[in-house]
Amino acid sequence: MYRWCMSRTNIDIDDELAAEVMRRFGLTTKRAAVDLALRRLVGSPLSREFLLGLEGVGWEGDLDDLRSDRPD
């Protein structure tokens, strides 16, 4: 879905927010923090390992009901 391409862009970002993202996710650069934020916002393709990790989470529901066009 996404082509791997990079371009250099200068942006002004909130240093405190960048530092918090770096702290929470163990990142070492602001570039990595911005990349993570963009990928999470757009929605990265889910890895096989992530999907396998969801197995057995215990979700219970009615998929047919979720798929219907009926309002609650």
Curated annotation (Swiss-Prot):
Pfam families listed in its UniProt record: VapB_antitoxin
Biological role stated in the UniProt entry: Antitoxin component of a type II toxin-antitoxin (TA) system. Upon expression in E.coli and M.smegmatis neutralizes the effect of cognate toxin VapC11.
Record carries keyword Lipoprotein: no
Protein name: Antitoxin VapB11
Any one GO biological process: detoxification
Keyword entries, A-Z: Toxin-antitoxin system
Entry superkingdom: Bacteria
Listed GO MF terms: toxin sequestering activity
Stated induction or repression of this protein's expression: Induced during infection of mouse macrophages.
